[in-house]
Amino acid sequence: LAAVNEEKLRDFGDPEIATRIAQYELAYRMQASVPELTDLSDEPESTFAEYGPGSRRKGSYAYNCIMARRLCERDVRFVQLFHMGWDQHKTLPKQIKGQCSDTDQPTAALIADLKRRGMLEDTLVVWGGEFGRTVYSQGTLTKTNYGRDHHPRCFSIFMAGARVQPGMTYGATDDHCYNVTENPVHVHDLHATMLHLLGIDHERLTFK
């Protein structure tokens, strides 16, 4: 296929053919790099100990955190991790323990790992979701079973790396965590901050 494309490029000199050749080559390089990327046999035991239980299990959050670091090492520009199942309208006491166990250690390990390798200055880590949960319970309240409802009025995210000022909090809620009372942040403000940290002027991307 490459030989045919090169022949057509010589015959017609069409820049779109050259672009298509480059796309095919990039796609091949990306696919060819996957086996090496996903082979964790070169990781020392200390890596798995740092990222915690489950870090050897493919598809687990801890495993994916290691994969995220390996992708960043290979200059992948954007990496997104998911951890599902936070919609706890009931059985929250049981579920939240498992989810925190899944995410706390690997998340901290990923940030520490990036910093130790000198990569955190050039990497922006953003942790968040699409909304928060109510501070009050939902459903029948017992010691072992209750839930929390959707709460889009206020919630928290955190950012690390990319010259983010560490240890700083911004914004506040009322005593019931129901409404924002200080320094509300619109999603556009969040986007502007993220773009600024990446060296991009957000106003050049803003259109009415």
Spans of features found by a protein language model:
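Ligand-binding pockets and gating/stacking loops
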Residues: 1-208
